[in-house]
């Protein structure tokens, strides 16, 4: 399994990594999550991402990892816990990481990301939205000094605003989801450049666009799905023609496309079908 250095962290991670959203109860039975996770680790994957907002993903992952003794990089996030969640409470943020450490059975978190730092209506992280200042930065600094976390990051879903937070230069890694894939490429215009300016590691989530690129939808594209615009339909048709010409499956092509971009260090794939 090919490995890269994740930006300025110096961490060596596999280009292909495991996303933890559907390790949770959303993904089905525990045994299925366990099988998928341990199989991924046995095949060489050494990086898994999770979050408190992913239901019971941290607890499930922690339980699974009791059966794994190999090296592993884990990222988790701040956001959504404890309830009622107050992103302006440094005490609550530190408490959330203490819970993550307990659930994951870890002494420290390799990468702690701020979840949705680019969506103020989701989580009001900042007291100064122009310079990206707030108690969350104080909490991160304290936890680094205490050895609770090693590196900090951003996990977001916008393209323009997330790039602006990257340009603050205050974070080591950026995880962008839904913004870079075969047919959605907004991240390449701003996020990748901002990350490069600050030597950040770049992680791309959902290369299959949460299912849009997991299987072919020929009938829907050609005869149904009235909510899809004609330009988008033509994109899908062109993609399907390319698949026919190359004989490659859509999942393989989708992951190969993202992972081959030199601006991308690591690609997260889900654990469920």
Show where each model-derived region lies.
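Conserved, mostly hydrophobic/aromatic
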Residues: 6, 18, 40, 48, ...
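Active-site groove signature of glycoside hydrolases
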Residues: 101-125
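Active-site mouth loops of central-metabolism enzymes
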Residues: 19-31, 78-94, 123-129
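Structural motif corresponding to the early beta-alpha repeats
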Residues: 67, 71-91, 114-118
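Beta/alpha (TIM)-barrel catalytic core signal, keyed to glycine-rich beta->alpha loops juxtaposed to Asp/Glu
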Residues: 3, 117-273
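Short amphipathic alpha-helices and their capping/turn segments at secondary-structure boundaries
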Residues: 1-9, 61-67, 93-104, 189-200
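Short, acidic/polar
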Residues: 27-40, 86-105, 157-164, 254
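N-terminal binding-site loop/beta-alpha segment at the start of enzyme catalytic domains
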Residues: 1-76
């Amino acid at each position: 399994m090919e490995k890269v250095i994740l930006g300025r962290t110096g961490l060596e991670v596999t280009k292909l990594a495991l996303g933890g959203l559907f390790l949770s109860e959303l993904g089905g039975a525990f045994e299925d999550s366990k099988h998928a996770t341990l199989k991924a680790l046995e095949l060489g994957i050494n990086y898994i991402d999770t979050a408190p907002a992913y239901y019971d993903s941290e607890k499930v992952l922690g339980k699974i990892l009791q059966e794994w003794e190999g090296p592993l990089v884990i990222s988790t996030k701040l956001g959504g816990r404890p309830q009622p969640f107050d992103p302006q409470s440094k005490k609550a943020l530190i408490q959330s990481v203490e819970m993550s450490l307990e659930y994951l059975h870890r002494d420290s978190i390799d990468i702690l990301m701020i979840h949705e730092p680019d969506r103020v209506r989701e989580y009001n992280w900042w007291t100064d939205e122009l310079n990206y200042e707030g108690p969350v930065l104080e909490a991160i600094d304290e936890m680094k000094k205490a050895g609770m976390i090693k590196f900090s990051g951003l996990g977001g879903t916008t393209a323009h605003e997330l790039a602006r937070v990257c340009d603050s230069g205050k974070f080591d890694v950026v995880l962008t989801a839904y913004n870079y894939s075969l047919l959605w490429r907004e991240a390449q215009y701003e996020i990748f450049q901002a990350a490069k300016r600050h030597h950040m590691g770049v992680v791309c989530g959902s290369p299959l666009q949460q299912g849009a690129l997991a299987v072919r939808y020929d009938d829907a594209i050609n005869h149904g799905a009235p909510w899809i615009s004609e330009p988008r339909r033509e994109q899908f048709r062109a993609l399907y023609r390319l698949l026919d010409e190359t004989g490659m499956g859509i999942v393989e092509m989708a992951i190969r496309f993202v992972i081959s971009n030199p601006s991308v260090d690591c690609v997260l794939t889900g654990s469920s079908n």
